[in-house]
Amino acid sequence: MIHLKRPNSPSKLINEEAKLTQEFLQNGNSVWGKPYIKLALLEMSNNKCVYCECRLDEESKYMEVEHFLPKDTYPNLVVNWRNLLPSCKRCNGKKGTHDSKKEPIINPTVDTPSNHIKMFNYCLKGKDLKGKTTVDVLHLNQLDRLVYPRMLIGTKTIETVEKLLEMAENFNLNINATGRIKSRIIHGTTQLLIEAQPHSEYSATVASVLFNNEDFVKLKEIMIKCTIWNTEHQKLLSNAERNILVEPLYNCLNNKN
């Protein structure tokens, strides 16, 4: 889970909010399912569930419009832009009719998730009552659906760092120091950091792993020494820092290019 910036309400929703709300109050129609609402929400979340960060189908097939404050309890907010979030079916179902006003949970467009939850061994733990309630209500430590995917991408991240570090160490020692290997190190590191960006699936997991990985720190130091760590790498790393759900063991932002 990462913080998201909510854009302004779609102009069409501004024009139709009163009419759609009245329609829901009168006959209970699913007025929140308008394509322009779904598309705006998907754009806001980079096509991901705001809670678990799983990828949502681009055609909205598997995306559900989640009401942060439940529509049955707060019907006048049924299409209020600030009450709508894009969610996967699993998270929307787990949250159900939970009243987030009476028992607050994290709203990723309002709160900074890392202030309330942390990651340990690919499981999420609450740092305060809001964080604990969020983890419990959304069942964010479901082993098969969430913890296992985090572990897989975390393991893949660690393996990628190890491969890049080995290439960088050899390059630094003038072993196989070809232009091709240089390009593989540069582009491989760029792609690795892209996986920690807000638009990538499970970006919080990737970012958290990188900022707690000694090999990644070594990789960065060697790349700086060999003058192949560039401004794009630094920018991507700075962006990734905003997504971490751990207290970093290493200050990866030191030794800036």
UniProtKB/Swiss-Prot annotation:
<dbReference type="GO" id="GO:0051607">
    <property type="term" value="P:defense response to virus"/>
</dbReference>
<feature type="domain" description="HNH">
    <location>
        <begin position="49"/>
        <end position="96"/>
    </location>
</feature>
<comment type="function">
    <text>Component of antiviral defense system Septu type I, composed of PtuA and PtuB. Expression of Septu type I in B.subtilis (strain BEST7003) confers resistance to phages SBSphiC and SBSphiJ. May be a nuclease.</text>
</comment>
<dbReference type="InterPro" id="IPR002711">
    <property type="entry name" value="HNH"/>
</dbReference>
<dbReference type="GO" id="GO:0008270">
    <property type="term" value="F:zinc ion binding"/>
</dbReference>
<dbReference type="GO" id="GO:0004519">
    <property type="term" value="F:endonuclease activity"/>
</dbReference>
<keyword id="KW-0051">Antiviral defense</keyword>
<keyword id="KW-0378">Hydrolase</keyword>
<keyword id="KW-0540">Nuclease</keyword>
<dbReference type="GO" id="GO:0003676">
    <property type="term" value="F:nucleic acid binding"/>
</dbReference>
<protein>
    <recommendedName>
        <fullName>Septu protein PtuB</fullName>
    </recommendedName>
</protein>
<dbReference type="Pfam" id="PF01844">
    <property type="entry name" value="HNH"/>
</dbReference>
<dbReference type="InterPro" id="IPR003615">
    <property type="entry name" value="HNH_nuc"/>
</dbReference>
